[in-house]
């Protein structure tokens, strides 16, 4: 081990036990603080009876260890009028109330939407919400929202001061609901309402594995989603948003899906997530201790 402090090298005295104990305790506390500021996990598949996930309504894990968001019959067929959600158990610290720091995050997942017809419904979403979030209505609301905040035309679709609708989502919408959707299937970003504030047309492929990556940059305050099928051009949609003004300090992340009279199988095949608050500049006294470690 090389120590950079010249005076310390010249004394050639070992660190005293009290100082070593202090440094050890300091590093342990530092680790604990950092661990609450960041979170990462990876599911290459979804083992049965996973204790890391919260299942709501019809969500389940299949015998093939895929995450099925909506109800599937014993014969493998999707059911009508189904709502299901799955959330990661450990909450994510999205921002720090005491410092105003905002987290960056990135999530990547692969999925397949499979329908017995070419008219599926209704879609699924990756979403961020308060830790005590509960399922919303099915059909076009994707299990995310209740009918009262379907649309707020006076504020571009955002439900103003609606504490029960603290949700940011990236939706993969397969069914066109005329009252709140563009006239095509789309990937959209929703903020407190099922009416997407940003969206792009999406060519759904029946039963084909797709990949999505969603990221948030706190410096630019930009939320970006990139979606692709094999051998196709990736689709990108982004939105400028200060998540600190929309969501609480602690949140949960997960998936939500629904069917109506039209049906589909919403399968999440793999999922990874990582988040971290912006690192603060080290204090002068911390730098002094670090010289001796």
Swiss-Prot record:
Mn(2+) binds at residues 171, 173, 181, 186. The keyword Membrane does not apply. It comes from the Eukaryota. Ca(2+) binds at residues 173, 175, 177, 181. It holds the Pfam family Lectin_legB. Mannose/glucose binding bark lectin. Homotetramer of four 32 kDa monomers which are post-translationally cleaved into a two subunits: A and B. This is Agglutinin-1.
């Amino acid at each position: 081990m090389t120590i950079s402090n010249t005076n310390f090298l010249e004394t050639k005295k070992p660190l005293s036990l009290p100082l070593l104990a202090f440094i050890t305790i300091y590093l342990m506390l530092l680790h604990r603080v950092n661990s609450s500021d960041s979170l990462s996990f990876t599911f290459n598949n979804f083992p049965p009876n996973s204790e890391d996930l919260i299942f709501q309504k019809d969500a389940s894990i299949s015998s093939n260890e895929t995450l099925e968001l909506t109800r599937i019959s014993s014969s493998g067929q999707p059911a009508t009028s189904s709502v299901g959600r799955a959330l990661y158990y450990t909450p994510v610290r999205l921002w720090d109330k005491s410092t105003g720091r905002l987290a960056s995050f990135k999530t990547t997942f692969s999925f397949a939407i499979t329908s017995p017809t070419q008219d599926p419904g209704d879609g699924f979403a990756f979403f961020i919400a308060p830790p005590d979030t509960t399922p919303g209505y099915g059909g076009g609301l994707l299990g995310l929202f209740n009918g009262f905040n379907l649309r707020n035309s006076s504020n571009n679709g955002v439900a103003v001061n609606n504490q029960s609708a603290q949700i940011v989502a990236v939706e993969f919408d397969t069914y066109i609901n005329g009252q709140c959707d563009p006239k095509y299937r789309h990937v959209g970003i929703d903020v407190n309402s099922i009416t997407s504030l940003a969206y792009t047309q999406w060519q759904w492929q029946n039963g084909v594995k797709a990949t999505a990556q969603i990221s948030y940059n706190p410096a630019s305050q930009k939320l970006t989603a990139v979606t692709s099928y094999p051998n196709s051009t990736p689709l990108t949609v982004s939105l400028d948003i200060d998540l600190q003004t929309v969501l609480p300090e602690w949140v949960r992340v997960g998936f939500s899906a629904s069917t109506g009279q039209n049906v589909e199988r919403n399968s999440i095949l793999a999922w990874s997530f990582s988040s971290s608050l912006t690192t603060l500049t080290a204090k002068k006294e911390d730098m002094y201790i670090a010289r001796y470690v």
